[in-house]
Amino acid sequence: MQVWAIIYDKADFPDTLYQNALPFVDQAVQSKIKRFHRREDACRSLIGSLLPRVLLRKRGVSRDEMTFATTENGKPYCTTPDIDPPLGFNVTHDESVIAMAFGSGDLGPPAYNLGVDVMQLKVPPRITFSEFVDSVSSQESDQLTARERNIVLADIPEGEALRRFYWVWTLKEAYTKALGIGLGFDFRRIQYDVLEEKVTIDGELARGWQFRKFEVAHSGNKYVGVAARFVGGRNPSITDLDEGSLVCYDAASFVNRAIEELV
């Protein structure tokens, strides 16, 4: 499993580059991108759409041969024939980072059980960290288990508490994205004990699952992310992403290269 992380800064991404890259995705995707009111949101969506296309091009697939579809729950997947081994991918973004996790599609076709999430380490404005945690673990919106809440609200520096919270959150998101499940999944069914590096689903070990953690930094801001994939077997695996399996690009360079490769 690998992750490509694209670092987007709107000040370094000229409008001409956006316009030049737009024709390299199909008309339906272009229409979706153009519906965004803010140009930076459109650019993030465009980059997210280019990522799997560049990956397929590296596999020797021409742009005209690339085809995609979505599951009933809206998860995109590759329908290009004769990809061997089959390809699983998932794209996510938060603020300046657009990330794609990908790997061989072994189980859970057609979209395969692979998901990724990334989040910037920050507290929303005008609230404290404890208020932030309360907002996602109250009776009305209870998305942390008691164990997770105790871990993130322990007597530790806020920076470490914030990291713990977002490790928990991104793992839960990556897992549900790997399943291809939309909104509505009860996050309390998933528990990630960041101290013991243990993931349980409905109280049982998450057997057969790989979870790979990664970090990205940009302009003084830090991001954490998790890629999740079901590979089968008995024992779950939770480790940092292997060195060399995380590749970061700045957005302008990536999109310029995408244009060159997809011509």
Curated annotation (Swiss-Prot):
One of its GO terms (cellular component) is cytosol. One of its GO terms (molecular function) is holo-[acyl-carrier-protein] synthase activity. It holds the Pfam family AASDHPPT_N. Keywords: Transferase. It comes from the Eukaryota. InterPro entries: 4-PPantetheinyl_Trfase_dom (IPR008278), 4-PPantetheinyl_Trfase_dom_sf (IPR037143), AASDHPPT_N (IPR055066), P-Pant_transferase_sf (IPR050559). The keyword rRNA-binding does not apply. It catalyses: apo-[ACP] + CoA = holo-[ACP] + adenosine 3',5'-bisphosphate + H(+). Its EC number is 2.7.8.7. GO terms for biological process: lysine biosynthetic process via aminoadipic acid. The keyword DNA damage does not apply. Belongs to the P-Pant transferase superfamily. Transfers the 4'-phosphopantetheine moiety from coenzyme A to a Ser of an acyl-carrier-protein. Activates the peptidyl carrier protein (PCP) domains of surfactin synthas. This is 4'-phosphopantetheinyl transferase pptA. It comes from Paxillus involutus (Naked brimcap). The gene is pptA.
